[in-house]
Amino acid sequence: MELSICSYSFHRLLETGEHDVFQYISDCHSLGCTQLDLWNGHLPSLLDDAARSPSSITPEYAQLSAGELEYLTRIKGSADSAGLPFGCLAVDGAHLYEDSPEMRQANQIKADRWLNIAAQLGAPQIRIDAGGSPEMTDEMFDVIVSGYHDLLPRAAEKGLEVLMENHWGASRTPENVERILQAVPGLGLLFDTGNWQEDKREAGWALGTHHARATHLKTYTFDDEGNETTVDIPRAMRMLQDAGYQGSWGIESVPRQGDEYEAAKKSVALVHRVLGTTPN
């Protein structure tokens, strides 16, 4: 059984300076994970494009400096020492749809930069968001589909599978996700148990569990018996099993309050309990 925790699960600790990518690796090892699902927010020194204007993001930006390569080598070495390979690198800020062609071009270059980073870490999967809005217009659809068609071959050259996630924008609607997946052979889905439009979650689960190549089993709140009180995680896992899911049981723990590490620990225990497996 493969088990992972997205590093976004520790974003509050990251924001206060109490966490970094090396602590994430250590925490995953302590929690008994078998792979690392890194969120690019945990690589702040590589994430400087927010301060750049779109016109300043030229193709050269996709290339990594000697210092950046050395930093990634350190991260990979730490992961190797912990016996943890990288799984899916979740990328924010390189989504495909923007109103402005200039912004689309800038995001394409950012995506190429993250392809290079994922390849350096040895990650087999990368999440690039669709963007857009839930009311996906034909123009949005065309831009998103064209963007994924353009991205997939470049990712494949680096041994990477591209995943979209039901995350935000157009991808919160099951009909949009299905339409995009059908239009882009080879595009995978990172299935998040949350994020769907509230009135479309059942349809989202039915779709997502059949297309999932990776998961974010999203947990928020636990009772004293260790049960998630807001989302039926056991049901989602059974649906995935019934659909023949073979990937890592990926967790995204987002506790509404309290200790992020303890919430992650409870999430891991819940997954083991559902599967009938013993924690490492």
Task: Describe these PLM feature segments.
Residues 40-42, 165-167, 254:
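A short gly/proline-enriched turn/hairpin at secondary-structure junctions
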Residues 7, 36-41, 88-93:
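Short, conserved active-site loops that position catalytic residues or coordinate cofactors/metal ions
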Residues 12-14, 44-47, 95-100, 132-138, ...:
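A short acidic, helix-capping loop that chelates divalent metal ions and anchors anionic groups
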Residues 65-188, 198, 261-262, 278-279:
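Active-site acidic/histidine proton-transfer and metal-coordination neighborhood
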Residues 1-34, 149, 156-157, 170-280:
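Histidine-acidic metal/acid-base catalytic patches
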